[in-house]
A protein has these predicted regions:
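Alpha-helical transmembrane segments of multi-pass membrane proteins predominantly involved
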Residues: 1-165
């Protein structure tokens, strides 16, 4: 899964730098307009990989070798107590991180932008839940190919456009 979504994450970081002129997150609060206005293709790519990162269908890959283990809990079947707790907490920390990146697309110098970003993050999270409940699993090969294709087209085109801007 990591090999599928990481190229888009790297392209997102490059696009944020090209659009804001800095890797400092505080710079987005100095912009005159939301950064999504210049890197909207990257945003679409990040939406695509967010489904992979949140482990939602169709990209919630099976991690166990036996069907009965997958029914129980997948790769966390043999975990319990503090170990399982740490895995679950870190999964939610990753969710907050990625949803925070979604919110960064909608921040600018206007204080209202924080409210706009929060509303959009909630809408995106509910979209992910809807996708999870309405699509069947795909094989890992399809996930890998489609994620790299989206990263190449959405991220690559947007980064190339910003390079010549």
């Amino acid at each position: 899964q990591v090999m599928s979504y990481e190229p888009m994450v790297l392209l997102m970081a490059v696009a944020f730098f090209q659009a804001s002129g800095s890797f400092d997150v505080a710079e987005v609060f100095q912009l005159n307009h939301p950064i999504i206005c210049t890197i909207w293709l990257v945003f679409l790519g990040v939406l695509f990989i967010l489904t992979i990162k949140l482990r939602k269908s169709p990209f919630d890959l099976s991690m166990s070798h036996h069907a009965h283990q997958e029914i129980v809990r997948g790769m966390t079947t043999e975990m319990s107590g503090p170990t399982l707790g740490m895995v679950e907490i870190m999964h939610w920390c990753e969710n907050v991180l990625f949803l925070g990146w979604i919110g960064m697309f909608f921040l600018w110098a206007n204080p209202v932008s924080v409210l706009v970003a929060i509303v959009i993050v909630l809408l995106v999270y509910f979209l992910e839940i809807w996708i999870d409940n309405n699509f069947a699993r795909v094989k890992w090969q399809f996930m890998f190919k489609s994620a790299w294709l989206v990263a190449l087209i959405a991220g690559g085109v947007n980064v190339a456009f910003l390079a010549f801007l």
